[in-house]
Amino acid sequence: MIFSILEHILTHISFSVVSIVLTIYFLTLLVNLDEIIGFFDSSDKGIIITFFCITGLLFTRWIYSGHFPLSNLYESLIFLSWSFSIIHMVSYFNKKQQNHLNAITAPSAIFIQGFATSGLLNKMPQSAILVPALQSQWLMMHVSMMILGYGALLCGSLLSIALLVITFRKVGPTFWKKNIKKKFLLNELFSFDVLYYINERNSILLQQNINFSFSRNYYRYQLIQQLDFWSFRIISLGFIFLTVGILSGAVWANETWGSYWNWDPKETWAFITWTIFAIYLHIKTNRNVRDINSAIVASIGFLLIWICYFGVNLLGIGLHSYGSFTSN
């Protein structure tokens, strides 16, 4: 009874804190409150509080249930939210350079935890005895590595998606302006009055706009470089976790079912996901390939992760259907 109450309290505290953090962060984006009262630093500290609350929640559930809390979808979602808070803390304690990981980790943590604690999963929060197939020491190794891999790959993929948005936003208006300018010059090619006006206008506005344009383009370039920097490193870390998780799962499957690989739906999609991110890392090793190409591959990987993570749970089929929606 005490453990249930403590788990309930920690769940609501962590969700409330991360909700406040997300609100503060969006306020800093809109009105730049961080320069006034330091709200931005407060939001980072809020994520740290959330991390300790979720850690306490997982330990409480571990002690109460007697097994590592990764036996159903609810527990895996809480663990996934915990992994996002870890990534946020790494970016928080890295004071050498400014990064924008908190724009990804804070919303991801609140959405995942909000879904886990919503009414959709109202039957899952109750801890249950493990089915015989899950009563193994490999549970902690395999599932924790897979969830950590999912968290890191999702975060890195979201950074790549942000890179694509900023890049295409940069290319689009530039292309439009070039075409409009070309049409204007062709139509007014022999209008010396218009040409004189353009020259005069450019000479007046040049000094006013050059500093602003340079600083804006430089900031955008720096932002794209930071997104690519963090995306590559976080995806690399997630790829390692995913690889270890797949290998440990193969060993566990051999002990349980007598075969290392059965082409189960979960195994198949995990292999497809692993292949996509292997292609991403291979592209990153080629310096002649633009960053936008690798970002597109990572964006595809983002969709595959959710298919791999939720696909079996939605269908409730295969050897990995424990804790699925339909099983409840």
From Swiss-Prot:
InterPro entries: Cyt_c_assembly, Cyt_c_biogenesis_CcsA, Cyt_c_biogenesis_CcsA/CcmC. The keyword Membrane applies. Keywords: Chloroplast, Cytochrome c-type biogenesis, Membrane, Plastid, Thylakoid, Transmembrane, Transmembrane helix. It comes from the Eukaryota. Signal peptide: none annotated. The chain crosses the membrane at residues 13-33, 46-66, 73-93, 101-121, 146-166, 234-254, 263-283, 295-315. Its main location: plastid. It is a multi-pass membrane protein. GO terms for biological process: cytochrome complex assembly. One of its GO terms (cellular component) is chloroplast thylakoid membrane. It is found in: Plastid, Chloroplast thylakoid membrane. GO terms for molecular function: heme binding. Belongs to the CcmF/CycK/Ccl1/NrfE/CcsA family. Required during biogenesis of c-type cytochromes (cytochrome c6 and cytochrome f) at the step of heme attachment. May interact with Ccs1. HAMAP family: CytC_CcsA. This is Cytochrome c biogenesis protein CcsA. It comes from Capsella bursa-pastoris (Shepherd's purse).
